């Protein structure tokens, strides 16, 4: 990765790859080293969703951080994102990560850790509305670029489970039938989940 970074000095991809690989080390990497890699990435592409996502995973409780550290990073990134940037959806990625960690740790898949309210508590609902406002509202072009599919699926999944049809319906219409495997697979069979919510909200092609 470092050789690629030297060969392609303006390309953020090698730095994204370095951060992705860093979380696979049993003890992670030194904070200063991660910070240097992040500075290199951020300087080349300050609004890279994939780059931010790799850091978010690194900071998650599943890897080398905590839920608090992960959410702080996601909300800080969302807070400085320009209107129309997809970075606010990092908060929905963080909520999925928290759910996965809690579900794996729970002996009783719902009652022991309150997973039934994970998607629809006040904080989760507010987060969905905030991402919707900052990212989607105001878009004049409702076409979906291939690189946006996964991010839109994360927001649609969150809106569905939060019980926000005013957000979920337009998102499902934008997606049409282009459901991605994740995050739907974390709450059931992905195809069945995507189809179920389209039917529940009466979204037609």
Task: Say what each PLM segment does.
Residues 145, 149-150, 154-205:
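Extended, charged low-complexity segments
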